[in-house]
Amino acid sequence: MKKNTHPEYRQVLFVDSSTGYKFVCGSTYQSEKTEVFEGKEYPVCYVSVSSSSHPFFTGSKKFVDAEGRVDKFLKRYSNVRQPAQQPQPEEDALPAAKGKKKVVTKKKK
C-alpha cells in the first residue's frame, strides 16, 4: 500500500467573514495562516457563509448579492459594444448548378 497518499486530517479554525463567528472542526484543509483560539493554535480557513450567517439557520432574509451575474456582466461591458458586421452575400462566388439532378433508384431483379 502507498504511504502518504491521503492529506492530513486535523482540527481547523473556520472564520465566517461576514459575522466574525469562529468554530473549530476537523478537516483536511491546508493553510499557511494560523490563529490562536481558546488557547490553541489552529490553521485558519475563511468562509463567506456559515451557519451563523446563512438565512436558513438565522431565520432572517439577508440579501447577499444585490446584482445578478448577468447584470454585472452587462454593466461591465455595456460601453464596449460594437455593431456586429453583416456577412456579405456570396452569390457570385458559387457557380450556378447546371443540368438536372440525378435520381438514384434501386433495380428490381
From Swiss-Prot:
Keywords for this protein? Ribonucleoprotein, Ribosomal protein
Question: What start-end ranges are recorded for coiled-coil regions in this protein?
Answer: none
Q: Name one GO molecular function term.
A: structural constituent of ribosome
The biological process GO terms on file are: translation
Cellular component annotations (GO), alphabetically ordered: ribonucleoprotein complex; ribosome
Q: One Pfam family, short name please?
A: Ribosomal_L31
Q: Where is the composition biased (Basic residues)?
A: 98-109
Classification via NCBIfam families? L31, PRK01678.1
What interactions and quaternary structure are annotated?
A: Part of the 50S ribosomal subunit.
Quote the protein name from its UniProt record: Large ribosomal subunit protein bL31B
Q: Which organism is the protein's source?
A: Chlamydia pneumoniae (Chlamydophila pneumoniae)
What is the phylogenetic placement of the source species in the record? Bacteria, Pseudomonadati, Chlamydiota, Chlamydiia, Chlamydiales
